């Protein structure tokens, strides 16, 4: 099964994995999240290129012998899809010699229609407007509170956005790590599992924590999960 969901991909992938595990014949799901954004962003795009990275993650999700309750929310709104998209390459505008032509924007960035376009202000405003109330709603539905969450592991476009999200949610910044872009770059749907592996490492092989996971981006799509993660068989970063 191949799901194209960009920066919300890990959350969407986990939701799909949980639904698959509801089937009696399925006991284990291997979830692969990978993106090679460096091939989608123009090298002459000073707005996006410095933040981009490539990564692939593997998450093995197994059926539990004990009842497990996981709360999740997923939302989509296509009215602002052009805030974060690759204009060409689909049926509406197939890739061609014309779409490969580089065009300079008002800020001096050069992109073709085959390159990723990220309207930073619009994406930032969307995240600050939509994500905090989604998290508040998720916690309300789960009968939980912000204080009972140990870690807020969110998709990481940049440190500034994560700091503003933490402040708006009223949670300590140290509970919402924001150091992935500076170490690995923004690798789209792979940033959340990279975040977990890099910041918690083998601690998750010995301990269990309450996590709030959130992804947001292309679509525009945003989603969140509230769940326990811990006592893992492995949790490591492999550099290449």
Model-found features: residue ranges?
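A short glycine/serine-rich beta->alpha loop
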Residues: 1-3, 44-46, 118, 122, ...
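Claisen-condensing/thiolase-fold acyl-transfer catalytic domains that form or cleave C-C bonds
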Residues: 3-25, 128, 132, 150-240
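Short beta-strand segments
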Residues: 4, 29-35, 61, 73, ...
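Short, well-ordered, mixed-charge alpha-helical segments that flank or form enzyme active sites
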Residues: 9-12, 37-41, 78-81
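Flexible, glycine-rich active-site loops centered on histidine and acidic residues
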Residues: 22-56
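Acidic-glycine-rich active-site phosphate/pyrophosphate-binding loop
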Residues: 31-37, 103-108, 161-174
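Condensing-enzyme catalytic core mediating Claisen C-C bond formation in acyl metabolism
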Residues: 45-125, 129, 133, 228-240
